[in-house]
């Protein structure tokens, strides 16, 4: 999976200075997997109207579902979520998989009295990771 090209993708262009390796997972089941040696891992991503749900698996444990959409997602913006913290200083494997799960975006927006001005903008369920925040280092 190659990073989005800022010359061809408006979202990638908007965040190129902070997320030069921004990728877009668009199909359920698409996944990224990596290993790191260290004690902390978080994901730096873009959330917005097209946000979806991601299964986060650390070291083969039970997946944790993380929704990449919140009551402020009427526009795209930078965000983070933690994969693991205070981990043993060892090699860890992380898998991030886009889920097919539908969820009620209108109800989430209603928490702030927001509405879906153009429902088609909210129809997709994507995941846009662009960076790792590690206390440690990537390993092959």
Question: Where in this protein do the model-derived segments appear?
Answer:
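Glycan-recognition surfaces in beta-rich domains, encompassing non-catalytic CBMs
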Residues: 1-140
């Amino acid at each position: 999976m190659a990073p989005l090209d800022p010359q061809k993708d408006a979202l990638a262009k908007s965040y190129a200075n902070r997320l030069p390796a921004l990728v877009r997972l668009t199909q359920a089941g698409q996944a990224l997997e990596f290993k790191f040696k260290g004690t902390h891992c978080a994901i730096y991503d873009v959330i917005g109207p097209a946000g979806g749900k991601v299964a986060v698996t650390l070291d083969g444990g039970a997946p944790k579902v993380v929704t990449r959409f919140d009551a402020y997602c009427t526009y795209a913006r930078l965000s983070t979520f933690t994969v693991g913290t205070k981990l043993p200083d060892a090699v860890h494997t992380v898998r991030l998989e886009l889920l097919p799960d539908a969820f009620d975006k209108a109800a989430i927006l209603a928490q702030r009295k927001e509405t879906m001005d153009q429902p088609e903008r909210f129809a997709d369920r994507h995941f846009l990771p662009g960076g790792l925040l590690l206390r440690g280092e990537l390993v092959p």
